[in-house]
Structure formats: C-alpha cells, structure tokens
C-alpha cells in the first residue's frame, strides 16, 4: 500500500464543515474496505489563511483515493503519491 496526498481548495469552509468532510472520508474508507477496496484516511492539515487542505490516505492506487473522495462528495484538485514522515 502507498501513501497519497489529496490537495483541496476549500474557500469559505467552516470548521464544522471540515470536520464533517473528515468524518465522511473516514466512513467511506470503511465502506470501501468492507467491499474489498482497501483505502484508509490518515489525517489532514488545513491552512485557513489559504483555504488549503492536504489530506493523507493509504491505498493501493490513486484511483481508490479518488473514488473515496468522489463518493464522499469531497472536492479535490489533485491526488499524488507522497511520503508520510512521521517521527
């Protein structure tokens, strides 16, 4: 499994809406995994001054990450493979 970063531009989003999007990503990941499509939300970093959000997912392909976000109705600008450098 690889790590993928999802870039998002979210102008005007509230913290409540951001929390709801996070919950939707987590739940859709569980649903897809139960269907045999292993994809997992890891975490997000939000930059309020730029309305920019970067989210990390673990999946075998970027298409699974896109599918999760599309089905959860969470907009994104790109999905790229990344490295999660957790200490």
Residue ranges and their predicted role:
Residues 74-85:
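Conserved short beta-strand edge segments in small beta-sheet-based binding/regulatory domains
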Residues 1-33, 47, 62-70, 84-87:
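Short S/T/G/P-rich N-terminal loop/turn motif that feeds into the first structured element of a domain
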Residues 56-58:
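Short hydrophobic/aromatic beta-strand micro-patches
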Residues 15-18, 52, 79:
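Short capping/connector residues at structural and topological boundaries
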Residues 46-54:
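Amphipathic, hydrophobic secondary-structure cores in small proteins
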Residues 38-44, 78:
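A short linear hydrophobic-aromatic micro-motif
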């Amino acid at each position: 499994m690889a790590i993928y970063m999802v870039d998002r531009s979210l102008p005007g989003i509230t913290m409540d809406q951001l929390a709801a999007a996070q919950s939707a990503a987590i739940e859709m990941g569980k649903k897809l995994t139960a269907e045999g499509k292993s994809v997992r939300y890891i975490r997000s970093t939000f930059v309020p001054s730029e309305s920019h959000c970067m989210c990390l997912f673990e999946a075998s392909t970027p298409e699974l990450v896109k599918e999760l976000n599309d089905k959860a109705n969470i907009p994104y600008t790109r999905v790229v493979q990344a490295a999660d450098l957790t200490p």
